[in-house]
Amino acid sequence: MASPAPGAGFQNKNRVAILAELDKEKRRLIQNSSMNNPGASIPLSRPALNKDFRDHAEQQHIAAQQKAALQHAHAHSSGFFITQDSSFGNLILPVLPRLDPPPPAES
């Protein structure tokens, strides 16, 4: 086996020292930035773009599910249904007619 060159160990230690110094400086800059601008951060990716794309695809999927559920309900029920956003995750909601209360009974 070939032995490493005599200066290789020194170069490696020098690299490690430089990288440690750069990391320390980076942490200091990030800390100063967050102190000067609370709530500000450096985005490392573009999650908003991906989230918007996912939300749009999810909306289309839900719309297709709502349409299918509505068609199924109208075909298999005598009631009337509408598509409506629901707090409980229902895709469609039944529409119930309002009936006038019966007149008071005379005695």
Swiss-Prot record:
UniProt xrefs under InterPro entries: SOSSC
Keyword field: DNA damage, DNA repair, Nucleus
Pfam families: SOSSC
Subcellular location(s) of the protein: Nucleus
Keyword DNA repair set for record: yes
GO cellular component: nucleoplasm; nucleus; SOSS complex
Domain of life: Eukaryota
Main location: nucleus
Any one biological process term the GO annotation gives: response to ionizing radiation
Keyword Metal-binding: no
Subunit structure: Belongs to the multiprotein complex Integrator. Component of the SOSS complex, composed of soss-b (soss-b1/nabp2 or soss-b2/nabp1), soss-a/ints3 and soss-c/inip.
Function: Component of the SOSS complex, a multiprotein complex that functions downstream of the MRN complex to promote DNA repair and G2/M checkpoint. The SOSS complex associates with single-stranded DNA at DNA lesions and influences diverse endpoints in the cellular DNA damage response including cell-cycle checkpoint activation, recombinational repair and maintenance of genomic stability. Required for efficient homologous recombination-dependent repair of double-strand breaks (DSBs).
Family, per entry: Belongs to the SOSS-C family.
Record-given protein name: SOSS complex subunit C
Organism this protein belongs to: Salmo salar
Gene name in the database record: inip
